[in-house]
Amino acid sequence: MIRLVAGNPLTRDAVMEEISAVADAGLEFHVVPGMSLPSTVPSFAGIALGSTYTEADLTNGPVDWDQLASAPQPLVFQATQEHLAEMAEALMERGFQGATPVTITTNGTTRLQRTFDATLQTVGNLDADLSGALVVTLGTVADDRSKYSWWENRPLYGWRVLVPRAKEQAGPMNARLTQYGAIPQSVPTISLEPPRNPAQMDRAI
């Protein structure tokens, strides 16, 4: 049996309970740690977190804003759009400036990733499609991401490109388009197949 978990499995309470049950039963198991979204997505957004930062999941129950407000920055949150206004209000009440840079990344690490820039003052009213899970990076490092952006600034990033080639010939073109950030979609226009009746081919020759 394989259990797939987003990020590091040993940070999930439900997974730990399952591992404990397996261990108590005397069964063998292996854990393959992955990188958590808060540590991975900012890199894909061009944000250099540095060696010290604080991450928190705003979707996982009550949030201790007092502790987060005094934690080492930058702050990296897992959140949804519904959490943004509450986050901004809570942190500004605890001394954060409204001009503090904030980035919001949706569909992180995929070819549909989009990163939006805001401030703590404006993030709650951001006019953007922020559906699904978000990774929010807050702090001065968010203001420098243009220096290190490498994923979303590729020349064809986000373009859907039709590749009208025979299925067997589309591979190299699809690979090149992907390198430039495009999303290739093969449209087979030619199919090379053996003759259904070899006798007809022999007569034609």
Describe the function of each predicted region:
Residues S39-P42, G61-V63, L112-F116, P194-A199:
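Short, charged, surface-exposed secondary-structure boundary motifs
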